[in-house]
């Protein structure tokens, strides 16, 4: 417990400083850059050219009429330690002249959280783009939160959807009204269209101001789609749970844990229209279907009365129908080659609204039914085929929860031998490829039937994540991996249940398609994310989740003649409310003939996403070496291009490594990406590698950056206000420090956040007072280590502040991830040697050290060494 209001723990005496001195001229330049970075940190999304904050950062070139971002050159060696505050800054502003916006407002251009371009100034020609070696792509996230109600966008419900007759793009804030407002010119293809009747009227026929319409004022808008945008009636949301009931799942507690979690969250499944339906199939060497009758106490609602046209006798008949004594029934199907449905599908896929109580009863019974099982089989392939047959008329989500490698029936897998293959050129082809073609062909069928597959794999054994992840990759789903799961561990159970709960309660869209339309001369040519590429530019999602991100590569096929170019992302989908909607997001970007302007407007975080997606593709389709080589060569090309096009006149170009300030974090991120568990050299179990690659494919940008360059907080010396609520009630977080062990004091306390886990590093020589305040013990050997949680110490304000900080980091409404906390004791000269516990601690320490990516990690170069190798390479 704390013995006084505030302790002062030992403080570092010598701050971490750059290892190379900064001369006066460099200091002046550094001050300029820092001032700019500070201004950027306070920018609001505002496209008006006379915005004060933008004018503070941008410059206008004589005669151009355009406001562009300034280029600030820096020597990367004088930027050590790297200024990591840049990683949390918003992107460079996009400045669009008011003359090019129908109704200028801060919502005229799409917020970067929805669509973020790698370039804020687009080269007018492909040759200029090639010269800069910078990629042109957009990062897309159609929905920002797990629940749609957390962030609603303007909705048009009048049925007036104005589209260009030539390119089929939607009206947006950048069109031009001509001919006294009777026509409008498309900003994407320049075609002149008629303004439709009803555009200037409301639903009652009264005149309205067209300049107040949502699509004119907002770059992100939803439309309530009329019937012509649907090929059939909006289907209900359907969930089929495939539960592994083999010995493994029973012994490690996954079956009981998952059944209880589904039970506790069944009422939180999206059911806005009251039509959500559920089926449960248990799987071992057979398929076990369940017939779930209507609840005995179900009463007909007013809505049901209306459906029966208010006829009292119909109501009586309905009450008679539901007042029955039917019981839950289980049907065992042992024929895995030709599995058949034991009864009609509409009796196995039951309405949640009418069967909730009986579903809860079934979920309570399932662990009891299979508690004495002796079956070690798991027939996933036949179960998937059965599930698709069950919901082929509606589509929906198949939720697979398993602890066992599929080992019988179609899609049967065997453990792959990793010995002698890990960390060799054969690793990708022999360990990370899809082992059975069933998992590829089945996803094609899923897309035809509008079915998504999500995997929750929790086991202490090999699961062939590389193969099973194909199910989610091409159906709009996801694979979640819980290695070493055991329900006897409260921390394992907490992580699994939190993530499954968030996943089940997440809003979804069904029958979704996404397309990007570009200005003449531009075309989307590469597509990354979990979906099915149905045609050259149409991405199909059986269901669209809310926690994934996508990236589209853009090519310049013809010269761009206009001052601005446009990219419009449209998504057609069906909500759980039963509504068919269209979400339209329009991005306007200035064009440029200057390499200097293009470099000055490049977005280092979006570029990192582009590099990541391409590296993951190469890792899966070629080799780990080709993925790392792609990262290295891409960065070398950018540095070479900058040297040639921008800094050739600099007399210090041979002794320095120059880049613009807005890209100064890119080398650090590329170095970190090469050290990520998904891509780094060394022996990494294939399930871990495949899971990490799968996560990189879909991670929203801010989490992706954190997984590449983890956030590190120093806690023992945090200011008084940190860990306490601010004026908005949010817990104040410490300022991050650089991810390097050189900043760690032997007596310090540090928290590391890599977006997937949290690590609490306790210095081996931490003072007893600190240990008492955090763990209620003055002996470091007595603190909990490994996967754990901080103890609740009501008498310790410091302990409460730490728990608040951890809680704030875990408090996210845009991801299902719950970060487990690992407590690690740092080395000390007094610690015992050769104990098993110390060997375990050594592996934990190695794991933590691998997150400190500025250092030399597992034979990967430190950041300084990485820069030196880059300088040597481009000066050859």
Curated annotation (Swiss-Prot):
<keyword id="KW-0931">ER-Golgi transport</keyword>
<keyword id="KW-0472">Membrane</keyword>
<dbReference type="Pfam" id="PF08033">
    <property type="entry name" value="Sec23_BS"/>
</dbReference>
<dbReference type="InterPro" id="IPR007123">
    <property type="entry name" value="Gelsolin-like_dom"/>
</dbReference>
<keyword id="KW-0256">Endoplasmic reticulum</keyword>
<dbReference type="GO" id="GO:0008270">
    <property type="term" value="F:zinc ion binding"/>
</dbReference>
<dbReference type="InterPro" id="IPR041742">
    <property type="entry name" value="Sec24-like_trunk_dom"/>
</dbReference>
<keyword id="KW-0963">Cytoplasm</keyword>
<dbReference type="InterPro" id="IPR036175">
    <property type="entry name" value="Sec23/24_helical_dom_sf"/>
</dbReference>
<dbReference type="GO" id="GO:0000139">
    <property type="term" value="C:Golgi membrane"/>
</dbReference>
<dbReference type="InterPro" id="IPR036465">
    <property type="entry name" value="vWFA_dom_sf"/>
</dbReference>
<dbReference type="Pfam" id="PF04815">
    <property type="entry name" value="Sec23_helical"/>
</dbReference>
<dbReference type="GO" id="GO:0030127">
    <property type="term" value="C:COPII vesicle coat"/>
</dbReference>
<keyword id="KW-0333">Golgi apparatus</keyword>
<dbReference type="GO" id="GO:0090110">
    <property type="term" value="P:COPII-coated vesicle cargo loading"/>
</dbReference>
<feature type="region of interest" description="Disordered">
    <location>
        <begin position="300"/>
        <end position="326"/>
    </location>
</feature>
<comment type="function">
    <text>Component of the COPII coat, that covers ER-derived vesicles involved in transport from the endoplasmic reticulum to the Golgi apparatus. COPII acts in the cytoplasm to promote the transport of secretory, plasma membrane, and vacuolar proteins from the endoplasmic reticulum to the Golgi complex.</text>
</comment>
<keyword id="KW-0653">Protein transport</keyword>
<dbReference type="InterPro" id="IPR050550">
    <property type="entry name" value="SEC23_SEC24_subfamily"/>
</dbReference>
<dbReference type="GO" id="GO:0006886">
    <property type="term" value="P:intracellular protein transport"/>
</dbReference>
<dbReference type="InterPro" id="IPR036174">
    <property type="entry name" value="Znf_Sec23_Sec24_sf"/>
</dbReference>
<dbReference type="GO" id="GO:0000149">
    <property type="term" value="F:SNARE binding"/>
</dbReference>
<feature type="compositionally biased region" description="Acidic residues">
    <location>
        <begin position="300"/>
        <end position="324"/>
    </location>
</feature>
<keyword id="KW-0597">Phosphoprotein</keyword>
<dbReference type="InterPro" id="IPR006896">
    <property type="entry name" value="Sec23/24_trunk_dom"/>
</dbReference>
<dbReference type="Pfam" id="PF04810">
    <property type="entry name" value="zf-Sec23_Sec24"/>
</dbReference>
<dbReference type="GO" id="GO:0070971">
    <property type="term" value="C:endoplasmic reticulum exit site"/>
</dbReference>
<dbReference type="InterPro" id="IPR036180">
    <property type="entry name" value="Gelsolin-like_dom_sf"/>
</dbReference>
<protein>
    <recommendedName>
        <fullName>SED5-binding protein 2</fullName>
    </recommendedName>
</protein>
<dbReference type="InterPro" id="IPR012990">
    <property type="entry name" value="Sec23_24_beta_S"/>
</dbReference>
<comment type="similarity">
    <text>Belongs to the SEC23/SEC24 family. SEC24 subfamily.</text>
</comment>
<dbReference type="GO" id="GO:0005789">
    <property type="term" value="C:endoplasmic reticulum membrane"/>
</dbReference>
<feature type="region of interest" description="Zinc finger-like">
    <location>
        <begin position="164"/>
        <end position="189"/>
    </location>
</feature>
<dbReference type="Pfam" id="PF00626">
    <property type="entry name" value="Gelsolin"/>
</dbReference>
<feature type="modified residue" description="Phosphoserine">
    <location>
        <position position="51"/>
    </location>
</feature>
<dbReference type="Pfam" id="PF04811">
    <property type="entry name" value="Sec23_trunk"/>
</dbReference>
<comment type="subunit">
    <text>COPII is composed of at least five proteins: the SEC23/24 complex, the SEC13/31 complex and SAR1. Interacts with GRH1.</text>
</comment>
<dbReference type="GO" id="GO:0005048">
    <property type="term" value="F:signal sequence binding"/>
</dbReference>
<dbReference type="InterPro" id="IPR006895">
    <property type="entry name" value="Znf_Sec23_Sec24"/>
</dbReference>
<dbReference type="InterPro" id="IPR006900">
    <property type="entry name" value="Sec23/24_helical_dom"/>
</dbReference>
<dbReference type="InterPro" id="IPR029006">
    <property type="entry name" value="ADF-H/Gelsolin-like_dom_sf"/>
</dbReference>
<keyword id="KW-0813">Transport</keyword>
